[in-house]
Curated annotation (Swiss-Prot):
The active site is at D60. It is an enzyme of class 3 (hydrolase). GO terms for cellular component: cytoplasm. NCBIfam families: PRK05254.1-1, PRK05254.1-2, PRK05254.1-4, PRK05254.1-5, ung. It is found in: Cytoplasm. This is Uracil-DNA glycosylase.
Length: 218
């Protein structure tokens, strides 16, 4: 089973075609959209469905130049590490002895190991956070979350912050592990994310299901 098997039907639906039309029209009038067209579906490119072990949900892509590249929380090489990702790194350093905070914010290495880094909205207009939140992406990403839940066993879902936690109803908690906390942003990191041990708990769960653990080092 691969992504095209479970998403082909979704991409034929009217709402999905409207998303693509909207993006094409925005480009025609000269608006800058992030990530670039080639990178919008990178989460699906780097994490194979048959290898998917962990889902980390983000909200919408970074909205400044050279940041977003289709993976939630991740930025391209050579770009400053954003505050939320810096706090994710601090939690990893606190909870995993061998983790050392890297000098970059590119999480492709996680994605290739089976960490699906999904933003619930896949595009954004330059410098306008949440500008594409109502164009239909959440219909698509809700379907993706539900299809992962239905078609895969033993997946770890990390839901950080109120927006991500609202997606819990799409997940069969009897067959998956759902880990919840506050968002790692500086505004809310101390309301539960700091000290959450999610990365340790994820690997403990994967081990209990005889699955390969994630090497969180970057």
């Amino acid at each position: 089973m691969n992504w095209s098997d479970i998403l082909a039907e979704e991409k034929q639906k009217p709402y999905f075609k409207k998303i693509l039309e909207f993006l094409a029209n925005e480009a025609l009038v000269g608006k800058t959209i992030f990530p670039t067209k080639a990178n919008i579906f990178n989460a699906f490119k780097y994490t194979r469905l048959d290898n998917l072990k962990v889902v980390i949900l983000g909200q919408d892509p970074y909205h400044n130049y050279n940041q977003a590249h289709g993976l939630a929380f991740s930025v391209q090489q050579g770009v400053d590490i954003p505050p939320s990702l810096r706090n994710i790194y601090k939690e990893l350093e606190r909870s995993i002895t061998e983790f050392k905070i890297p000098e970059h914010g590119c999480l492709i290495n996680w994605a290739k190991q089976g960490v699906f880094l999904l933003n619930t909205t896949l595009t954004v207009e330059a410098h306008k956070a949440n500008s594409h939140k109502d164009i239909g992406w959440e219909i698509f990403t809700d379907a993706v979350i539900q299809k992962i839940s239905n078609n895969k066993p033993n997946v770890v879902f990390m839901l950080w912050g109120s927006h991500a936690r609202k997606k819990k109803n799409l997940i069969d908690t009897a067959k998956h592990l759902v880990l919840e906390s506050s968002h790692p942003s500086p505004l809310s990191v101390y309301r539960g994310f700091d000290g959450c041990d999610h990365f340790v708990k994820a690997n403990q769960y994967l081990t209990s299901k005889d699955l390969d653990i994630i090497d969180w080092r970057l």
